Structures are given as C-alpha cells and as structure tokens.
Amino acid sequence: MAFLMSEFIGLGLAGAGVLSNALLRRQELQLQKQAMENGLVLKADQLGRLGFNPNEVKNVIVGNSFSSNVRLSNMHNDASVVNAYNVYNPASNGIRKKIKSLNNSVKIYNTTGESSV
C-alpha cells in the first residue's frame, strides 16, 4: 500500500510541475505580447511625430492583405521633422557630426597650391 501511495504522490508532483510550467509559459507569452504592443505604439508615435500619415503608419505596422504596397510617402522636410528625426535617431547625430568635422577639416587646394578654405 505504501508503494501505491508514493506513486500517487509522484504523479501528483509531476502534474503540478506540468501545470506550473504551463502557467509560466502563459505568463511569458503575455509579457512578450505586451512588450511587442508597447513597441508598436512607440514606433507609431515616433513615425507620427516625423510627419507620416497615421493611417499609413498603421497599415505599415499592422499590415493587411488588401494594401500590402503602402508606402510612407508624405514626409515633410521641415525643421520640426528634422529635429524630431535627430531626437529619435541619436546614431545619425553622431554620423552627421563626424561628417561635419571631416568637411571642416578638409582643405581644398587649387592648381597653384593655395587653400581656398
């Protein structure tokens, strides 16, 4: 009888382990979904601030079979958009600074060897 009792306890523990793993997996999937949704909302907000049409942004991010060829076309090239782009893309700021410093350091010589800069 003791043998049957230990088997029963073992099966109970195994079942509890499976249930625990299933609950952990469900919680992990919920967190992944929440993180993805938060990321999409942030991306849509960034693109909206850059001057893109919110409907186009939604179609590009969410996507649907009817309008698979949507392009983000209506970008406005004004100072506010450029500033917003700089805020959202700090890497591009670094590249722009390097290019600017390179351009400032380059000296252009004419055929007589005189610097024009």
UniProtKB/Swiss-Prot annotation:
Keywords: Capsid decoration protein, Capsid protein, Host cytoplasm, Virion
Main subcellular location: virion
Keyword Signal set for record: no
Coiled-coil spans in chain: none
Keyword Calcium: no
Localization (cell): Virion; Host cytoplasm
Domain of life: Viruses
InterPro entries listed in its UniProt record: VP2_lagovirus
Family: Belongs to the lagovirus VP2 protein family.
Other remarks in the entry: Translated by a ribosomal termination-reinitiation process from the bicistronic mRNA coding for VP1 and VP2.
Assembly behavior: Homooligomer. The portal-like structure consists in 12 copies of VP2. Interacts with capsid protein VP1.
Function (record text): Minor structural protein that forms a portal-like structure at a unique three-fold axis of symmetry, following binding to the host receptor. The channel formed by VP2 may allow the delivery of the viral genome through the host endosomal membrane.
Domain remark text: The N-terminus domain points away from the virion surface.
Name of the protein in question: Minor capsid protein VP2
UniProt source species: Rabbit hemorrhagic disease virus (strain Rabbit/Germany/FRG/1989) (Ra/LV/RHDV/GH/1989/GE)
